[in-house]
From Swiss-Prot:
Coiled coil: none annotated. GO terms for biological process: regulation of actin filament-based process; regulation of cell motility; sorocarp morphogenesis. Belongs to the costars family. It comes from the Eukaryota. Modulates actin dynamics and cell motility. Pfam families: Costars. Disruption phenotype: Cells form smooth plaques on bacterial lawns, produce abnormally small fruiting bodies and display reduced migration towards the cAMP source in chemotactic assays. Analysis of cell motion in cAMP gradients reveals decreased speed suggesting a defect in the cellular machinery for motility. Cells exhibit changes in the actin cytoskeleton, showing aberrant distribution of F-actin in fluorescence cell staining and an increased amount of cytoskeleton associated actin. There is also excessive pseudopod formation. One of its GO terms (cellular component) is pseudopodium. This is Protein costars. The gene is cosA.
Amino acid sequence: MDVDHEVKELVKFIKKLGTKGADGKYSVKYGVLFNDDDVANFFEALVGTLKAAKKRGIITFQGEILLQRVHDNVDVILLKDE
């Protein structure tokens, strides 16, 4: 599976699991994303996909990398619907 496909699937999961804010952007807590069974079954390396999506300007989150438990309450925000 290629990174572009994984990023597109990540966008779908953020929209499915997240909520749309007043600014029209979807966001989801990292812990919700990480602990979802469908997400866990789809992504071999969720952190790598998140980093790739952030580098492409599709999502944003505070910090460079997200770790389970430590960053469970960090918002992953969808910037572009691609």
